[in-house]
């Protein structure tokens, strides 16, 4: 089918494509979040429960992405004191459905 330089070129192209695709996927899947010792240490029991801790971390990350232009330290503020700050509550409000918020207000 392909002989000589064409075959080498095709093999090189396939290897290059696989390498680029794999490295791009790795960049997307890797967690690039840097956690400070005070937020993720043993003093924060919330993070011991991995699914809950992961959701809380993600809320802070997404909130930071939305508000980093006005509050550049939002990620740190949100995670401070083991997610008990007003900044975390503000972020949580952003991602709480309106209907649920209305239900909570009526209930309490």
Curated annotation (Swiss-Prot):
Keywords: Disulfide bond. Disulfide bonds join 44-82, 60-78, 63-91. GO terms for biological process: ATF6-mediated unfolded protein response; circadian rhythm; PERK-mediated unfolded protein response. The keyword Transferase does not apply. One of its GO terms (cellular component) is extracellular region. One of its GO terms (molecular function) is neuropeptide hormone activity. It holds the Pfam family Crust_neurohorm. Belongs to the arthropod CHH/MIH/GIH/VIH hormone family. This is Uncharacterized protein ZC168.2. It comes from Caenorhabditis elegans.
């Amino acid at each position: 089918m392909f002989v000589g330089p064409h075959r080498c070129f095709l093999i090189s192209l396939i290897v290059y494509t696989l390498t680029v695709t794999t490295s791009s996927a790795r960049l997307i899947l890797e967690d690039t979040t840097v956690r400070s010792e005070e937020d993720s240490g043993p003093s924060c029991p919330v993070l011991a429960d991995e699914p809950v801790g992961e959701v809380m971390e993600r809320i802070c990350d997404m909130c930071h992405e939305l508000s980093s232009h006005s509050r550049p330290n939002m990620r740190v503020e949100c995670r401070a004191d083991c997610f008990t700050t007003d900044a975390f509550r503000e972020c949580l409000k952003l991602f709480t459905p309106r209907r649920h918020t209305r239900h909570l207000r009526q209930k309490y």
